[in-house]
UniProtKB/Swiss-Prot annotation:
GO terms, molecular function: asparaginyl-tRNA synthase (glutamine-hydrolyzing) activity; ATP binding; glutaminyl-tRNA synthase (glutamine-hydrolyzing) activity
Domain of life the protein comes from: Bacteria
Gene (UniProt): gatB
Family: Belongs to the GatB/GatE family. GatB subfamily.
Annotated function: Allows the formation of correctly charged Asn-tRNA(Asn) or Gln-tRNA(Gln) through the transamidation of misacylated Asp-tRNA(Asn) or Glu-tRNA(Gln) in organisms which lack either or both of asparaginyl-tRNA or glutaminyl-tRNA synthetases. The reaction takes place in the presence of glutamine and ATP through an activated phospho-Asp-tRNA(Asn) or phospho-Glu-tRNA(Gln).
Record's keyword terms, sorted: ATP-binding, Ligase, Nucleotide-binding, Protein biosynthesis
SUBUNIT field: Heterotrimer of A, B and C subunits.
Top EC class of this enzyme: ligase
Biological process terms in GO annotation: glutaminyl-tRNAGln biosynthesis via transamidation; translation
Enzyme Commission numbers on file: 6.3.5.-
SUPFAM superfamilies reported in the protein's UniProt record: GatB/YqeY motif, Glutamine synthetase/guanido kinase
Pfam families: GatB_N (PF02934), GatB_Yqey (PF02637)
Protein name: Aspartyl/glutamyl-tRNA(Asn/Gln) amidotransferase subunit B
Taxon lineage: Bacteria, Pseudomonadati, Pseudomonadota, Betaproteobacteria, Burkholderiales
Length: 490
């Protein structure tokens, strides 16, 4: 039986976060009434000329530096010629032979797949290029009684098209790459990453070949995948389709396909024979883009600390695991919140801070469907909760209750934890004599568990600990309860 290898390359369109379009001064704001943000340049009216947006170029430079790519000192804009109703000029301004960003790489973390028996691993994906181009308008097919409406608000919006080498070997790797790239462009501030609004969308080139064969199989390109789930589902379906087709004696046709999320399948859009011959040629209205070394150095000096460097620093500075560091640097906001907590609670509490962010804080954020930026518990408030655990004022169980209380009341005061502790009498019982008296009562009321423990049943001891904690309403130190119980049980 033939063993198959999957070959995947991704082309990703990241909408650059400029205020105006790439070749005009029209706004890029999402959600405006149709055709209210299209100026004469976007509409291709006679006598207008494009003027390159410096901000778009700077964002491309920033991306190139972040991935260790070559930023071309001289690149060319080209006309990509094709006809479509939402493309007013009859061509798209893009880059072809000489892109602004060349090469580079992104390291991805592929999660474990227990069902398939695969462990987590890291992999470096090489990039071919990233080039600047303008977006097309939008064709609207609904609510027009069999006709198509054209909205040109999006026409001319700046895009950075990022192209990988065909090095990914599974849908899991493709999704891991897409997530890493998404996180990076958002971290750099060059793209807002809003997939629902089309700010970040992928085209997947998928083929299969027998294991060991060097020659690539015939590929299909799946267009405009705007969610990580769609990307994974589309690739998995396409891989199954191609393998079944070949094993049934058929041949894969090079074509463009669309993903149908309702049916969870891909369907043919156009074959190679119908594919466009774009007839690229240099745009005579735009001078070559020349980027000097001083410009690159200035952008480099303004770059934020990159996620990989921050992960390494968190491991070395705070003693957290590599995995934890990866989670904590998943977004710039999460990393900033963590460091703000540690700055207040002290470096000695860094590990417990990491545990709280990945546990209770993330759980509450998911429950309420919000990001860390909107967390109602400030870093200073959480830091005080952690300090009260560390100094023995409260137990971990009580700390969780206090955290939820601060969250639910959206307390504004930095000392909210202390206020709630005092108001509800939540201080941990530290008086050994008082705790011993409670434990004596627990032992007297649970004679059966005492007998079972002395007969060698360890579970009985845990039951006694639980009863003691219940009797103290969770205000006892669990470690102290353990020690006193062991002492009294001999």
């Amino acid at each position: 039986m033939t063993q198959w290898e999957v070959v995947i390359g991704l082309e990703t369109h990241a909408q650059l976060s400029t205020v105006s379009k790439i070749f005009s001064g029209a706004s890029t704001q999402f959600g405006a009434e149709p055709n209210t943000q299209a100026c004469p340049v976007d509409l291709a009216l006679p006598g207008v000329l494009p003027v390159l947006n410096r901000g778009a170029v700077e964002r491309a430079i920033r991306f190139g530096l972040a991935i260790g790519a070559t930023v071309a000192p001289r690149s060319i804009f080209a006309r990509k010629n094709y006809f479509y109703p939402d493309l007013p000029k009859g061509y798209q301004i893009s880059q072809y032979e000489i892109p602004v960003v060349q090469g580079g790489q992104i390291t991805i973390q592929v999660p474990a797949n227990e069902k398939a028996g695969k462990q987590a691993y890291s992999k470096t994906v090489n990039l071919t290029r990233a080039h600047l181009e303008e977006d097309a308008g939008k064709s609207l097919h609904e609510d027009f009684a069999g006709m198509t409406g054209i909205d040109l608000n999006r026409a001319g919006t700046p895009l950075l098209e990022i192209v990988t080498e065909p090095e990914m070997r599974s849908a899991a790797e493709a999704v891991a790459y897409a997530k890493a790239l998404h996180g990076l462009v958002v971290w750099l501030g060059i793209c807002d990453g809003n997939m629902q609004e089309g700010s970040f969308r992928c085209d997947a080139n998928v083929s299969v070949r027998p294991v060991g064969q060097e020659k690539f199989g015939t590929r299909a390109e799946i267009k405009n995948l705007n969610s990580f789930r769609f990307l994974e589902d589309a690739i998995n379906y396409e891989v199954r389709r191609q393998i079944e087709l070949i094993e049934d004696g058929g041949e894969v046709v090079q074509e463009t396909r669309l993903y149908d999320p309702d049916k969870r399948e891909t369907r043919s859009m156009r074959s190679k024979e119908d594919a466009h011959d774009y007839r690229y040629f240099p745009d005579p209205d735009l001078m070559p883009l020349v980027i000097g070394a001083d410009w690159i150095e200035r952008v480099k000096g303004e770059m934020p600390e990159l996620p990989a460097a921050m992960q390494q620093r968190f491991v070395e500075q705070y003693g957290v695991s590599a995995y934890d560091a990866g989670v904590l640097t998943s977004t710039k906001a999460m990393a900033a919140y963590f460091e703000a907590v540690v700055a207040k609670a002290g470096a000695a509490n860094a590990k417990i801070a990491a545990n709280w962010l990945m546990g209770d804080v993330s759980s509450q954020l998911n429950r309420d469907g919000i990001d860390i930026d909107a967390c109602p518990v400030s870093a200073a408030q959480l830091a005080l909760v952690l300090q009260r655990i560390a100094d023995g004022t409260i137990s971990n169980k009580i700390a969780k209750e206090i955290f939820v209380a601060i969250w639910d009341e959206k307390a504004a005061d930095e000392g909210a934890a202390d206020r709630i502790i005092d108001a509800k009498g939540l201080k941990q019982i530290s008086d050994t004599g008082a705790l011993e008296a409670i434990i004596d009562e627990v032992l007297a009321a649970n004679a059966k568990s005492v007998e079972e423990f002395r007969a060698g049943k360890e579970k009985a001891f845990n039951a006694l600990v639980g009863q003691a904690m219940k009797a103290t309403k969770g205000k006892a130190n669990p470690q102290q309860v353990n020690e006193l119980l062991k002492k009294k049980l001999g």
